[in-house]
Amino acid sequence: MLLIRPLLRANEARRHRTHVVVFFIFLVANAGGALTPLGDPPLFLGFLQGVDFFWTAGNLWRETLMMWGLLLAVFFAIDSYYDRLGREALPDLTDATPDAAGPLRIEGRVNFVLLAGILGLVLMSGLWKPGIVFHVMGTEVLLQNVVRDAGLVALAFASLWLTPATARAGNAFNWAPILEVAKLFAGIFITIGPVIAMLKAGVDGPFAAIVRLVNDSAGQPNNAMYFWATGLLSSFLDNAPTYLVFFNTAGGDARMLMTEGASTLAAISAAAVFMGANTYIGNAPNLMVKAIAESRGLRMPSFFGYMLWSGAVLVPIFVLMTFVFFR
């Protein structure tokens, strides 16, 4: 969210920009968060379940480097093709960052402090476990989560109050993308409950066939199937709760999964993070980036149009990754 507006501004004089935003979603909004629990919600849920903070960096760096390298190579090929066409520059476009505007400066620097506070609150909720639980309408709510969420809301209001209006105006900030994504994901999370409950039922539920696929006849995990089952469901059900379902299907014991089950946990983690990019609804930032780009006048692919991009670019990478890492 910090980078998409500067990226759009840097490329606004170009004729072909859609591929830039699509690959931004692939790389930054998804694959870029594969190495720590702060990078993507599925890994954060794993952290809350007891997975060590640096476990993902130590066990997913090969898959992540492969993903980054191949995506950057494909992007370079597409971008170079458009450049060779020789018609990239749009005529008579006013420079959004003229040299006469004065020296380079950063407005709203207080938000760096608030951002550090956000990271601190997120880490706190995974490290501080006082054991205090509240029951709200039949749902267990942990004290550390209450403190985290209240702190995040307070920091959001602090940012609104402390950030100069000129900084938001300069970034063409508006609430429309946030409201659009909030409404859509509110609907997704309301309707996803029964589906997640059916998945949690395991071999006794309606998705028993899928659950049985991830283990062989001897009960041993099939890492390739964990990778694809987690990934495909993450693409359409949101990757965070899907990660948690398959984490528990694999045993739910973080200590065991980080040691003898490391390859299985790696398959689940990689699938949830990487395949969250397969659709706009696989990961909330995907839709946010799309909405921000459209608010700046860029025509983005439709839901199924975006899936054509992900199918052509991402799926071959996932197939290769299966043979290299998850056989």
Protein language model regions, located:
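Hydrophobic alpha-helical transmembrane segments of polytopic
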Residues: 22-25, 107-114, 118, 148-155, ...
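Intrinsically disordered, low-complexity non-transmembrane regions of multi-pass membrane transporters
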Residues: 78-115, 158-175, 299-300
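Transmembrane alpha-helical segments of multi-pass membrane transport proteins and ion-pumping complexes
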Residues: 1, 34-38, 64-76, 80, ...
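Alpha-helical transmembrane segments and their helix-start/interface "positive-inside/aromatic belt" motifs
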Residues: 17-23, 102-114, 172-186, 307-310
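Transmembrane helix-loop junctions at the membrane interface of multipass transporters and ion channels
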Residues: 35, 40-57, 119-136, 322-326
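Juxtamembrane and boundary regions of transmembrane helices in multi-pass small-molecule transporters
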Residues: 13-19, 23, 35, 54-100, ...
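Membrane-interfacial helix-loop connectors
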Residues: 2-16, 20-24, 28, 45-61, ...
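Transmembrane helical segments that form the transport core of multi-pass membrane transport proteins
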Residues: 115-245
